[in-house]
């Protein structure tokens, strides 16, 4: 399967479910810690859907988080109206009551990154079913979820991926994610090709940003090929087989009527007042967009650097801490950008580790920059130290690593002169090029000196010594 995809028009809408960090579940006092607990220990009659079990009123923190999320996505909050919890009926082993409780919208008609937000609401997570062994763990049952339903405005897999990355960054800024952040998405996609509009297909329970991207890439090709052969894209629900990176038909597409929504008679509706919304707004943190704007204005960095820094809350906070510790001026800001946004980020990506788990803190970078400014280490050695910090999970400070490994800048002038003369002797072609006016040959010779000294030479002094000998 393949071919040119430029002639295919894609429409995609996402239903995104994000677990939020509350101590207790949405409708009972059971712990939400299902990852570390023994199976079926953090449960009660409400979690297990036992007859006669009465749910508590909705978890207040979960409602407040839903309001915050809706506000940050530009939604209008549904105020002074009853917000009901409904029973959404379907049969599956992880749903002991036979229905899932889900609220009517808390926020509507928003926009984020140019993608329309249809609604934001709360719902409870079902349990965890393992079909391979036929066992169910209900510890997760009742954990609060935020569901964000987008409009079908997404036009490409790449746009979907970027949207989800920025959305998860938003949740991290709110500080409401459980652990590293658990996200699942139902992906709705249809295409138009050769003048034919295909039916909408839903792919259920895709549990990663990468998965959503792969689903859309696969479905674009699959649906295009069906239309190309004169067939009809079926309106259906499909499953994502992550191990094979393909989708597989599950059943015909459900409608709202299939779920038999009814208001839950055991839960009183909630009403959000304007006063409550204002109180929540006062507690809301700075958004990534606002932080990016402030970094550009306050520190004078360019927009691309600011965008990269604020895409990771830990990195943004480290940048500010480093700059304030060193003193806010252009030199220190530039150094902080270089060693955090460029070098530390490079090392983290290479070693496939996130900043928050790397053990590298602001004080490590502050000490590293001071060693550079004081001429104790060269730029090349500083890059090695960054890698060592990541590898060793920040267990040792830069100064300690430099002393242990003998990485300080060479102060012995005779040793430096010897390395310079050796580089000149071993590279006659570069010497000839320099004497013929090719100034870049000087940089090559400097690189040879740095290689001979294992990066411990002072580049400025090396250039001076090279010129003294070559310009005679």
Curated annotation (Swiss-Prot):
Can you state which reaction this protein catalyses? L-glutamyl-tRNA(Gln) + L-glutamine + ATP + H2O = L-glutaminyl-tRNA(Gln) + L-glutamate + ADP + phosphate + H(+); L-aspartyl-tRNA(Asn) + L-glutamine + ATP + H2O = L-asparaginyl-tRNA(Asn) + L-glutamate + ADP + phosphate + 2 H(+)
Q: Name one GO biological process term.
A: translation
Sorted UniProt keywords: ATP-binding, Ligase, Nucleotide-binding, Protein biosynthesis
Q: What is this protein called?
A: Aspartyl/glutamyl-tRNA(Asn/Gln) amidotransferase subunit B
Q: Which organism is it from?
A: Methanocaldococcus jannaschii (strain ATCC 43067 / DSM 2661 / JAL-1 / JCM 10045 / NBRC 100440) (Methanococcus jannaschii)
* Function recorded in the entry: Allows the formation of correctly charged Asn-tRNA(Asn) or Gln-tRNA(Gln) through the transamidation of misacylated Asp-tRNA(Asn) or Glu-tRNA(Gln) in organisms which lack either or both of asparaginyl-tRNA or glutaminyl-tRNA synthetases. The reaction takes place in the presence of glutamine and ATP through an activated phospho-Asp-tRNA(Asn) or phospho-Glu-tRNA(Gln).
Q: What class of enzyme is it?
A: ligase
* InterPro entries registered for this protein in UniProt: Asn/Gln-tRNA_amidoTrfase_suB/E, Asn/Gln-tRNA_Trfase_suB/E_cat, Asn/Gln_amidotransferase, Asn/Gln_tRNA_amidoTrase-B-like, GatB, GatB_C_1, GatB_Yqey_C_2, Gln-tRNA_amidoTrfase_suB_CS
Subunit and interaction comment: Heterotrimer of A, B and C subunits.
**GO MF, one annotated term:** ATP binding
Family membership noted in the UniProt record: Belongs to the GatB/GatE family. GatB subfamily.
Task: Cite the EC number.
Answer: 6.3.5.-
């Amino acid at each position: 399967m393949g071919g040119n995809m430029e002639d295919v028009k894609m429409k995609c809408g996402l239903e995104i479910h994000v677990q939020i960090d509350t101590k207790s579940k949405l409708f009972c006092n059971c712990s939400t810690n299902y990852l570390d607990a023994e199976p079926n220990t953090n449960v009660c009659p409400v979690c297990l859907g036992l007859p006669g079990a009465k749910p508590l009123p909705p978890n207040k923190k979960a409602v407040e988080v839903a309001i915050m999320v809706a506000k940050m996505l530009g939604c209008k909050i549904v105020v002074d109206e009853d917000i009901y919890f409904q029973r959404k009926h379907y049969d599956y082993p992880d749903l002991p009551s036979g229905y899932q409780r889900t609220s009517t919208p808390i926020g509507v008609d928003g926009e984020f990154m140019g993608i329309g937000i249809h609604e934001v609401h709360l719902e409870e997570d079902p349990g965890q079913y393992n079909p391979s062994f036929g066992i169910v763990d209900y510890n997760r049952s009742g954990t609060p979820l935020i569901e964000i339903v987008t409009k079908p405005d997404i036009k490409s897999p790449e746009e979907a991926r970027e949207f989800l990355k920025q959305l998860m960054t938003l949740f991290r800024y709110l500080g409401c994610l459980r652990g590293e952040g658990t996200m699942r998405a139902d992906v709705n996609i249809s295409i138009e090709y050769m003048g034919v509009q295909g039916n909408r297909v839903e792919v259920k329970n895709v549990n990663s940003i990468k998965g959503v991207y792969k689903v859309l890439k696969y479905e674009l090709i699959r649906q295009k090929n069906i239309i190309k052969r004169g067939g009809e894209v079926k309106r259906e629900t499909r499953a994502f087989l992550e191990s094979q990176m393909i989708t597989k038909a599950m059943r015909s597409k459900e409608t709202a009527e299939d779920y038999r929504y009814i208001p839950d008679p055991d839960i009183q509706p909630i009403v959000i007042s304007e006063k409550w919304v204002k109180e929540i707004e006062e507690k809301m943190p700075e958004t990534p967009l606002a932080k990016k704007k402030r970094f550009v204005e306050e520190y004078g960095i360019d927009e691309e650097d600011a965008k990269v820094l604020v895409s990771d809350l830990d990195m943004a906070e480290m940048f500010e801490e480093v700059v304030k510790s060193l003193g806010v001026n252009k030199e220190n800001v530039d150094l902080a950008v270089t060693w955090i946004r460029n070098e530390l980020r490079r090392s983290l990506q290479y070693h496939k580790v996130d900043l928050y788990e790397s053990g590298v803190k602001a004080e490590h970078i502050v000490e590293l920059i001071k060693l550079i400014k004081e001429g104790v280490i060269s730029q090349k050695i500083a890059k090695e130290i960054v890698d060592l910090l990541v590898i060793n999970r920040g267990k040792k400070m830069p100064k300690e690593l430099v002393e242990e490994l003998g990485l300080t800048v060479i102060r012995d002038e005779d040793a430096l002169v010897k390395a310079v003369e050796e580089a000149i002797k071993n590279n006659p072609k570069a010497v000839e090029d320099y004497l013929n006016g090719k100034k870049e040959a000087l940089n090559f010779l400097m690189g040879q000196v740095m290689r001979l000294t294992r990066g411990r030479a002072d580049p400025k002094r090396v250039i001076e010594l090279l010129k003294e000998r070559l310009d005679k």
